[in-house]
């Protein structure tokens, strides 16, 4: 895998691309889901990404299936139409994201068991909690869930969904 270090992943991409943070985030998602742009194909991260896509495609064709990391879900060649290397990578990427999120949710529900604090909304990569005033320590326990999985987080708080 590629080591981004301790900093924010999109800030690292911004430095690689020599663009601002928002543009870096946009460029990264476009390339992960649509294919690596020629002007970035020599960056170490995208070299590794391209190699991962190529080896998965070869394995998929040779074995007739590809087994996803974490979930062990099998994408079977005889069940999927119009497959290509990038599309297969997208399927694997989304499966991996879902698998990681299930692990996060499982651990968070363990932290919240018996507590008044509740997870009230989960979308994609965001989690909204209604934190009981007497349970502020729960937030640190939730942060620890992400730390143990080596995931970076950003947090905001407020009295309503607008964080005011």
Give a label for each model feature.
Residues 1-9:
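Extended active-site and interfacial segments that coordinate phosphate-rich ligands
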Residues 133-164:
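Polymerase palm active-site segment centered on the conserved acidic dipeptide of motif C
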Residues 35-38, 128, 136:
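Short acidic, S/G/P-rich loop/turn micro-motifs used as interaction or catalytic elements
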Residues 8-122, 149-151:
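Conserved catalytic core of nucleic-acid polymerases
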Residues 1, 14, 92-95, 138, ...:
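Structured N-terminal alpha/beta-domain signature
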Residues 125-131:
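A generic structural motif
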